[in-house]
Amino acid sequence: MLFNVGYSETVKLFDWDCLVFHDVDLLPEDDRNLYTCPDQPRHMSVAVDKFNYQLPYKGLFGGVSAISVQHFTLVNGFSNQYWGWGGEDDDMAKRLGSQKLNITRQCGPLSLVEVHRGLALIG
């Protein structure tokens, strides 16, 4: 639900065209990682150290994700049915798929992410 609140407040400040949803405990290992929105939604935290730099499952869209305001609006944002940790990102992946949007994935060194243990609240 806080992702939707963040969106609502952010679009009041400026006419943004790109949104990046970023878990606070994930830190990119390469500072050349560009926080931009391509033509399709992009999952940016593909290779997380916690998962041995492997994508845990195909439908993952959590951690760090970039999506255009147009696509976010098209899928009506994140579901407000989830409280606490987990589930909202998988639901978003399904929402994107239902609108025939394809999740793209950043690959190579730019996709490497480390979980900052001092910031992790769960897991």
Residue ranges and their predicted role:
Residues 1-16, 51:
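Active-site-proximal specificity loops/subdomain of glycosyltransferases
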Residues 1-3, 32-35, 56-58, 77, ...:
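Short coil/turn segments at secondary-structure boundaries
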